[in-house]
Amino acid sequence: MTVLKNDRYLKALLREPVDMTPVWMMRQAGRYLPEYKATRAKAGDFMSLCRNADLACEVTLQPLRRYDLDAAILFSDILTIPDAMGLGLSFGVGEGPKFARPIDNKSAVQNLPIPDPEQELQYVMNAVRTIRRELKGEVPLIGFSGSPWTLATYMVEGGSSKAFTKIKKMMYSEPKILHLLLDKLADAVILYLNAQINAGVQAVMVFDTWGGVLGHREYLDFSLQYMHKIVDGLIRENDGYKVPVTLFTKGGGLWLEAMASTGCDALGLDWTVNLAEAKARVGHKVALQGNMDPSVLYASPARIEQEVQQILADFGQGSGHVFNLGHGIHQDVPEISPKVFVDAVHQYSIFYHQ
C-alpha cells in the first residue's frame, strides 16, 4: 500500500474531512508554461511527446515544481483510443486534431479493433508507471479518458467541429450505427482506464467535452448511458485505496442529478453552474469539482483572489469540493496568475474546514 504524503484530493472526492480545499488545474501541464514549450520542441511534435514516457513524465511534473498543486494529471490526450484504433491521427501546427480515416458507415464501425492497453497503448501505461515512480508519493496521479460520445464526435467529424452536423446526421438517421460505435468505445475506455489504474493512477476522470451540444433526451441516450456503463466497469479499489471516478460534461449543468445517479464519486462543473445550487442538488451524493472560469486568470491578483473567495463561499462548509477551473487553463495567462489562484484556494479555504 502506497502512503501518500498529500491525499487531500482523494479524500475530498470521497467527501471525507480535509484540512483545506484541494486544487489542481485542467491542462495544468501545457502551453502556458515556457518549460513545456521547450520540452515539446525537444519531442518534435505533440504525439511524440505523449509517446515518450520520460518526456510525458517531465511535463506532468513541471506544474508541480511551480505551484502547490494537490494532484498530478497524466500528460496524454483524449484521442489516444481512436488513434490506437487506426484512424490516422495528426495534429497540424496551430490546428486541432485531424483523422485521415473518419468513420462514416456500419462496416467502418464493425471493423474497428478494440485496442489492447498494454500493446497499442503501452506508451500511456509506461508514462503512468514512470510518473508514479518520480512522484515519490507526494500527490496522487489522475488518469483520464474522453467519453464515448466525445471520442465519437472526433471520429465521425474527422476532427474538431463547431456544428457537429456529421455525427448528428448519424444520430438521427442511423442511430443503431452510432450506438454500435459508442458501445465499442465504452468497452475500449473501460479497458484503457482499468489498465491506467493497474499501472498506478489513483483516480480517474472521464471528459465529456461535447456532451453539452446534445438535446436532453439525446444526452441521456447517446452520452450518459455510455459513461454509466464505464463507471459500472471500472476498478474502484486498488493498492488499499478507493479509486474515485469523476465525470465532467462541459455544458452539463442541466443533467447533474442524472450524472450523479451513475454511481460516480464526483462531478466536474464548468463555470456556467452556480456551485451553491449544484451542492444543493447533488452534494449529498457526489463531490463537486470546479468551477472558476479560466479567463479569470487574465485578471489582477486581487480579482483572482476575490473570485476564489466567492466560489469557496458558494460551496460553504465541509469537504466534497475539489477546486479547479471550469475548463482547461488558457495558454496566454500571466505567469503569476496560476500561483495566485492555487495559493488563494489553500489560504482562504482553511476557514471552511474548521
From Swiss-Prot:
Q: Name one GO cellular component term.
A: cytosol
Enzyme class, broadest EC rank: lyase
Instruction: Quote the subcellular location field of this record.
Output: Cytoplasm
Write down the position(s) of the site called Transition state stabilizer.
Answer: 77
Q: Which PROSITE patterns match?
A: UROD_1, UROD_2
Alphabetical list of InterPro entries matching this protein: UROD/MetE-like_sf, Uroporphyrinogen_deCO2ase_HemE, Uroporphyrinogen_deCOase
Q: What is its EC number?
A: 4.1.1.37
Superkingdom field = Bacteria
Keyword field: Cytoplasm, Decarboxylase, Lyase, Porphyrin biosynthesis
Q: Which Gene3D superfamilies match?
A: 3.20.20.210
SUPFAM superfamilies, from UniProt?
UROD/MetE-like
User: What GO biological process terms are annotated to this protein in UniProt?
Assistant: protoporphyrinogen IX biosynthetic process from glutamate
Function, in words: Catalyzes the decarboxylation of four acetate groups of uroporphyrinogen-III to yield coproporphyrinogen-III.
Q: Which PANTHER family match?
A: METHYLTETRAHYDROFOLATE:HOMOCYSTEINE METHYLTRANSFERASE RELATED, UROPORPHYRINOGEN DECARBOXYLASE
Question: Which family, according to UniProt?
Answer: Belongs to the uroporphyrinogen decarboxylase family.
How is this protein named in the record? Uroporphyrinogen decarboxylase
To which species is this protein native? Histophilus somni (strain 2336) (Haemophilus somnus)
